[in-house]
Amino acid sequence: MNAVEQRRAVSQLLVVRASGHAGDHQRRYPRWELSNGELQRLLAKGIGGVILLGGTATELQQRCRTLRSWAGHDDLLLCADVEEGVGQRFEGATWLVPPMALGRLQSNDPEKAMVLAERYGRCTADQARRCGLNWVLAPVCDVNSNPANPVINVRAWGQIPEAAGALAEAFQRGLQAGGVLGCAKHFPGHGDTAQDSHLELPVLRHSRERLEQIELRPFRRLIAAGVDSVMTAHLVVPAFDAEWPATLSPRVLTDLLRNSFDFQGLIVTDALVMEAITGLVGPGEAAVQAFEAGADLILMPADADKAIDAVCAALDSGRIPSLRLEQSLQRRRDALRRCSGAQARNEAASPPDAGETSDERQLALELVSATLERQGGTPIEPPAGGGVTLIRVDGVLACPFLRPDAPAIGWPTSCGFRPIICHDLGISPWHEPPQGDNPLDLDRLGDGPVLLQLFLRGNPFRAGRDRDEPWPAAIRQLLQLNRLVGMAVYGCPYRWESLRVLLPDTIPAAYSPGQMADAQQMLMGLLLGDEQTLGLGSEFTD
């Protein structure tokens, strides 16, 4: 091929990021999300994929049509990180409980968990397809064996390899039945790290024998089941390569994944804009090293033009043989052919609306109901003189589940509990400086009984800051003063397990792995009584 053809071919292997919204002014993360002008320019030059975030399901549907129109063809890989259903990222679609919810259910009812995991995958695939996506960046195949993991946490299907692998495989079956591509991630395993690779480069110091027993087992299982793609992890695994992170390591991607595991599908990098990579090499060299190591697709290069230039130069110099380019292009064509055929078979059954069907709505409720946990006494009586619901969220600026009409706010408010929402950029409930056994500054809360609600889970870019907060001491402080009347934990099961044991049997408490309105509604119903109503209205003003 000539230089122009080669550049267009290399461009097909890049996946850039864009907003699901139509307008540039609506971009949530303009640092990473390309403008419409840049998108049109790159798509015209042959960019082969787009990862989308933000907007409604209907907006996403139109956005995907627009992107294909700008590209001038339908052979685009259009994907999203929808590990918890399409509604996790796009409003109006179904947001499902995190995968670890089914991992906990699996220990008590494995048959039910497996059935729900497959339905979970099928729901995700059906909605993704109706919205215009053909590639779901899930399932997570990391085994969350480290409770202190700041970034995987509830995204994993479990903390036991066999259960995590079985549930991820069931989810993948649902994706395949729904006609979209799946992606097992993050190879060779990100579950036993205490660092966030969005911010730094983790090192996984285990023997190969241990890695085979824990980290690698779900990936072997998904590959045997025919998963379409595998995403790399930005971490160093000295048992395989002591120098380079897996994303840039031929020993991991070619020797282990491609040759030893005999994986014939697409290998895609995790986002190359993450600090674990940008802290090592520039945008051009990162793309070259990843491709040289064995990756087929380059996700979110820090600079798409520099990435294309560098890979073309590496091909021209002979650093990377032209056969590698041909192999990656063929794998990409094969993947598109598979999902195009499956999508065609599902086309007739798909309703035109991008939003959720009644069956999908029912699945969301069933998943919340099946995975919630409770303990303790009878529902809380409305406080005669008023009380406080102390709500801790781990990211108020990206908090779609806690609007003024959210059940976690509205239901307690209707019962006489005044909401106080704590977050990193706002009010702090803590004494400054810390006061040991009495960490809460109760003067900031006011008088009355306290209903505690914690919305805490593993999230990227937080570096585990929430783990340092003294919630056990806070609960003991409130108990000593006879002020704690109930507790709800949404998200992290490890936080729930550490706090629930501190409560006497007389205090009702409940847990859901999910944080969405459905989970709030069910937990508030358990704690405050089903006969209560939200009672929203004039209490919320501009």
Show the residue positions of the predicted features.
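Preference for extracellular/luminal or secreted protein segments
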Residues: M1-E38, G46, N259, V281-D542
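Second-shell residues forming the walls of enzyme active-site clefts
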Residues: A3, H25-Y29, V50, T56-L76, ...
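Active-site mouth loops of central-metabolism enzymes
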Residues: L13-L34, P99-R119, E200-I214, V273-V281
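Short glycine-enriched loops at secondary-structure junctions
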Residues: S19, A80-G92, N134-N144, A184-H190, ...
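Catalytic domains of carbohydrate-active enzymes, especially glycoside hydrolases
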Residues: S35-L53, R122-W135
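Surface-exposed, active-site-proximal loop segments in enzymatic domains
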Residues: E91-S107, N146-W157, D196-P202
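Alpha-helical scaffold segments that flank or form the walls of functional sites
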Residues: N108-L133, A224, A286-E292
